[in-house]
């Protein structure tokens, strides 16, 4: 699921100082790539050092630009303590604010829900609290969490999903509801795993707006704690508020970026074997926010002559 920020901020609200900021996009070096000759003489590329002291070339791989953020900030101006949220994502997010300490300022209305849905690419005023008559400067301590998506979302596609690969190609489904092995959580219960060779073209199953991309990981494996976060993926927001997730994509193969509007059937990336994965495949799921929790929803694919195909473990899926 999309990561959630949970910072605790404690600042003394006083005079507002405006400072011009210089912004630089500096790539972070996330992984090391080892290049060496294997036992058979072929070149080996790995995130793990060779087992002996043989000659090896090591390269630091750039981690790519920073991911969008959701932040809450406050200021004291015109006798009021003001809190505002910024959503940098090209998708709505749900945000919950918790006030842990508040001094020398009015308290929010106890009936006010400190829960908001922030529109995509937006700045939202959360609250404005008047200073009390005491001489002290207002002080606030707060915590916030957020999750992608609008909890009012209802899954309502206008047609079956397109199989997420080239027309006339067919690949086996290795995991689909209800015959699940690793898809045990709500976020993956209705996900579909499709076995395909590394480098197979991945196409959008439904049109929408790209809002998250991770494409610089190159490793895969069966260690959940180490490998789960290393999956390359694309997330595309649909018109009904759900989003499509395409995961385990190949390194440096993603052809879209956040903010791009993609059409159904558009070539978006190549399949791979990155992240927590036992072999090359595409993990596809449609997900919605159900109130600070995510769940995958059942999908059907378009078959021949407009028919509907329910994905099933052990069957072939063909793109039309």
Q: What positions do the PLM features span?
A:
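Short, cationic interaction patches enriched in Lys/Arg with P/S/T/G and frequent prolines
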Residues: 2, 29-125, 134-139
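Active-site loop architecture of trypsin-fold serine endopeptidases
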Residues: 217-226, 271-283
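Acidic, glycine-rich catalytic/binding loops that coordinate metals and/or anionic ligands
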Residues: 158-174, 203, 226-229, 254-263, ...
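Bacterial N-terminal signal peptides
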Residues: 15-25
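N-terminal secretory signal peptides that target proteins for export/translocation
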Residues: 1-11
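Short histidine-centered loop motifs in beta-beta connectors
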Residues: 197, 203, 238-265
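Short hydrophobic beta/alpha edge segments that flank linear recognition/processing sites
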Residues: 234, 263-275
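Surface-exposed, glycine-biased beta-strand/turn segments
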Residues: 114-230
